[in-house]
Amino acid sequence: MAKKDKTSVKKSVKETASKKGAIEKPSKSKKITKEAAKEIAKQSSKTDVSPKKSKKEAKRASSPEPSKKSVKKQKKSKKKEESSSESESESSSSESESSSSESESSSSESESSSSESSSSESEEEVIVKTEEKKESSSESSSSSESEEEEEAVVKIEEKKESSSDSSSESSSSESESESSSSESEEEEEVVEKTEEKKEGSSESSSDSESSSDSSSESGDSDSSSDSESESSSEDEKKRKAEPASEERPAKITKPSQDSNETCTVFVGRLSWNVDDQWLGQEFEEYGTIVGARVIMDGQSGRSKGYGYVDFETPEAAKAAVAANGTKEIDGRMVNLDLSNPRPANPQPYAQQRAGNFGDQLSEPSDTVFVGNLSFNATEDDLSTAFGGCGDIQSIRLPTDPQSGRLKGFGYVTFSDIDSAKKCVEMNGHFIAGRPCRLDFSTPRTGGGSRGGRGGFGGRGGFGGRGGFGGGRGRGRGGARSGNPNRGSVAPFSGNKVTFD
């Protein structure tokens, strides 16, 4: 009965294997299986890679690439089949336990045969694995997915056959059946691990191919995808760097000082005690001072209560104006503000004045009249201003006899007329902060300085009516004092008109 059960089990196992698409293995002789395995190994080593590629490419073209979901479903089906094969092996091992008491001679023969079959199967699996590694290294990542599926199916079928053979041939003892089952479990674990690794590598390679769009069929798809991803990242960096370089602002250059910026500060609400030197000392802390002047009244000689401070740079002038509202001089809070800048070309000022007052140039002479002079101007200021025009013979600045202050004009005498003409061309030049009016001076006429014959005598005492008035009028008083009828009344002459 036991033998009948064994034969029925073998038939059922073979039927299940044929239904699932497994390859039926002849069990007549074990030597035939060894020779067949060797022939398969030789044929696989002799075959070239190119026909495999062509077959696989044809398969790939005919059948679409399996998706990840289909691969997972196949894994689940594989696990189910493996579990069913294990259950069959366990049932066969239990049957072998019941039949272990038949004969010891058959057990020894079955031991040798089982060991030979297990060794032959292990050799076949090693050969298949080496071939798979070679194929995976030489073939592209896209074709590796379809190959792995086929190899996985072949392995499962081989395992089923080995499990069925071991179950049919392990009728010797319990220990042998346990060893075969443990070996089959270990092999299944190894195969599962290798399949998982291959699936992970194939998935990563397919991802890299989709990102890099490479059509190469080499096995180093990962390295190619890495290189392409690096090149793409470098291109992106370059693209980002190009607009950044274009958007870079140009180097900031310091703005040149505008010629219209003023360096003069107006100072208001000054005390009458403040003079030029005092005013300059009060503003030395803000920058280099070129000049300082307090505006004075020409008649009284007293300060008008304001002045000007000239700095070397506009920045110093702005710093001084920033102290407005906090600056005190001689106990008084002063007002500070920027003065109107001097025009670079003073000619418009001279032309405007000439249009307003009808100024006309006099006949050329060697003496130049300088009008609109500041009361603070000195002979040195005029010498510095007009020294470049020619050789200066003399400089005169008339003063008031009562106050001793300047009258606001002067005279500059040159050695020749050409130098004087050059000086007049500087009409509107600033001296001590004021634009000067330049003209040729007319020469003096004689006979009028002391009033002619009327001079210092006559009944008018000290020149009579002609007196000092004649001197100032350039002879007008002298002409009047020279009247032959000195002090007498002129006789009446004319027609007498009466009205009736």
UniProtKB/Swiss-Prot annotation:
Cell compartment(s), UniProt: Nucleus, Nucleolus
Gene3D superfamilies from the UniProt entry: 3.30.70.330
Modified residues (Phosphoserine): 143-144, 146
Any one Gene Ontology cellular component term annotated for this protein: dense fibrillar component
SMART domains found in the cross-reference section: RRM (SM00360)
Compositional bias (Basic residues): 69-78
Alphabetical keyword list: Nucleus, Phosphoprotein, Repeat, Ribosome biogenesis, RNA-binding, rRNA processing
SUPFAM superfamilies: RNA-binding domain, RBD
RRM domain span: 263-341, 366-443
Keyword rRNA processing attached: yes
GO biological process: chromatin remodeling; rRNA metabolic process; rRNA processing
Spans annotated as Disordered: 1-262, 441-500
Ranges of biased composition (kind: Gly residues): 445-480
Biased composition (Acidic residues): 219-233
Chain intervals with Low complexity compositional bias: 90-120, 164-182, 202-218
Compositionally biased intervals (Basic and acidic residues): 1-41, 59-68, 126-137, 152-163, 191-201, 234-250
Pfam families: RRM_1
Function of the protein: Helps the assembly of pre-ribosomal particles containing 18S rRNA.
Name assigned to this protein: Protein gar2
